[in-house]
Structures are given as C-alpha cells and as structure tokens.
C-alpha cells in the first residue's frame, strides 16, 4: 500500500472526529430536550387533574319542553364540580337520559375548558286522548302527557283507548301519516270485537266514517284521498279498509245513530 495514501486516510479520520462528536452532542441535546418537555407535560397533566378546571363546571340543556332541566341532569349523573370532564362517556350518558319515555334522542357535546351541553329531542305530540271529558296530549311513542289541554286541529282525538299497548301501536301508525291526513281525522275510536282486537273506527272531518285495523292502518289510510276523490260529495258513508276496500253508503238512521255503539 502507498504510504501517502495511508497518511491521507489518517488525516481524513482526524478531520471527521470533531464532526462526529458534534453530531453526537446535538443528538444527546435533542433527547434531553424531549425528555424535559415530556416531563413538564406530565407535570402539567397531573396538576390539571388535581385542579377544579378538570371537572365539569357548566351543564346546559337545550330542546326540552316537557322534561325539566333538573330531571335530565339527574338522569345523566353529571355533577358540576365533581364529574371529570375528559373521562365522561358521552354514549353511556346519552343512553341514561333516553330512559325517560318522553325523550326520543339525547346528544352530548363538550366545549373547552369544561362545559357540557345536552341537546334533547322529545317525542312530538300527534293526537289527544279523551278521558272523562278531559283531553291529554299523546306522543308519537304512545306516552300520554299529564297536563290537561284543549284540542286543536293538530291531530285526532282518541276515544276508548285505555289499552296502553294498543294506544302505543296506534300512535306509531298515526306518526307514519302526513300532517294533512292526520288533520283530516276528527276522532278515532278503539272498537275491538271478539274476532278482531285491532278494529278501529274513524270519524272524518269531511263527514265520512272509516273502519280499519291498527296493524295496517297507515298503509291503508294513505289511499283515503284517492278513494274519496272517486265518490260523490253528496253521498256520505262508511269506507271499509280492514281487508277489502269498499264503500257503504249511510242508511236513513245511520247518521243519527252512528256513534251510539262507541259511547
């Protein structure tokens, strides 16, 4: 090997040693800085968790009308100044609130630094229940609100609906109708017979009477506008929608006695 080449290699290595030392020093410094930053972040987290700012400070409730703010907060188990803000399980808490039969949906959102908002969607009123000449709102899931009300044109009046299960089924069927069709119904009587526990009778605002079954009511009732458009306006009667659809004109005594079998 050429002695001159050996000397060049030795010189090159000696020149690189300071650079290697500097690179190692910089790498060590970066590690130290990263460790210090991580240490301070952990300290800040520990301090944060030990201070009141890590707890829920404010709870707001929106969208509720029939369920009080206090009742919703009680159901949520969220306690201001006690519940951990970051560890709050939103889905679990929403399910707790939705145990209330008037609440259709609950949605929880968080906003910094420690505020909680509970957005409520309640079941809407779709009918009125008549009981001892007093009226109560019926919700789309069949629940009945406790306060007395005066009926308007928002929905039909339900009569003889003491069976809660059947009332709930009827409410779901009504909810499937358009608003205009619901508003065309004056009263709905629950009129079960031995062979058909789902039989109902409707008195329409246009003078017609409809007989139907709870289970098929929504689908069959959607054909009502088409049916009456084919009937003479001066001939009223009963439109049967249980099995086969057909029209039966009132007899002479039907109009006077048409509600006697329900009362």
UniProtKB/Swiss-Prot annotation:
It is found in: Cell membrane. InterPro entries: Cell_div_FtsQ/DivIB_C (IPR005548), DivIB (IPR026580), FtsQ_DivIB (IPR050487), POTRA (IPR034746), POTRA_FtsQ_type (IPR013685). The extracellular region contains three distinct subdomains: a membrane proximal alpha domain, a central beta domain and an unstructured C-terminal gamma domain. The C-terminal region of the beta domain is critical for interaction with PBP-2B. Contains multiple septal localization epitopes that are located within the transmembrane region and within the extracellular region. These epitopes may represent sites of interaction with other divisomal proteins. This is Cell division protein DivIB. Changing residue 140 to A: Does not affect growth. It comes from Bacillus subtilis (strain 168). PANTHER family: CELL DIVISION PROTEIN DIVIB (PTHR37820), CELL DIVISION PROTEIN FTSQ (PTHR37820:SF1). HAMAP family: DivIB. GO terms for cellular component: cell division site; plasma membrane.
